[in-house]
Amino acid sequence: MGAASISQAVYAAEEPAKPAAAAPAVVKPDPAKGDTLFNTAPPNGVSCASCHNADGNSAVAVNPKLAQQHPEYILKQLQEFKAGKRKSAIMQPMVQHLSTQDMRDISWFLGSKPVKNGFSKEKDLVALGERIYRGGIPDRMIPACAGCHSPNGAGIPAQYPRLGGQHADYTDAQLKSFRDGVRANSAQMTGVARKMNDREIKAVSDYIAGLR
């Protein structure tokens, strides 16, 4: 090997490795942009607010209240609608035009809005609903809802959704969807709901509506 070749080999060995490419920076959520996205209809479409109201407090019992929900939970649901992991003939087309940043902006906008209080309506079931929510049904291995969603329904940020004040009709429908395998994006909730009958689901859903 010639001197020039040796010199080149030594230089190559000593040349510092190039730094790895930096990961793309995560852009901070912009609730103001989220407000615009939520309340503005896309071309040939309808706005999110048309079903959930301008501040996320849906007045229609089958449409969920989104106000004050943990942003991380909303973001996860939007992403799973788009990916098809959570099925909905209404929501899947609604989110297809949204980027991840759009979803983040919308999620943090909704998380910043106060939820309006709800009310329990089923007087004959409220005691059963409270018993299930706070203590579960131990002999059937049904855990207390409060263990994950907190005694007042506030949930745990970035882990478990807020439930307090949610429309009973919506909660009832979601629990049945988990139970019947229609909604399959939470193995934990599917396992719980499969052990509950219609009366128990109705009772706990009504109790949740009155939490605050």
Residue map of PLM features:
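The feature marks the first
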Residues: P24-A83
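Electrostatic cytochrome c docking/interface patches
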Residues: A13-P42, V60, S112-P138
